[in-house]
Amino acid sequence: MKNIRKACVEAIFREFENECDAIRPAAGDGWDEIEARRSLGHIVGCIDLDVTDLVDIVVDTINKEL
């Protein structure tokens, strides 16, 4: 289970790093105002989360890990 959890966290951070739709600035093109703090497991800033896309990322990652 620990490996699946780690894989899901990594997948979400990759989504952020690729500037995809699941995690994006709440206003305009403010990517520079959002910070990924991997060591803490946080993405910090004024963001807009697409929960459906995040769930898809997690489910897809779990399916790959099983």
Predicted regions mapped to residue ranges:
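Protein-protein interaction and targeting regions used for scaffolding, dimerization, and localization
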Residues: 1-66
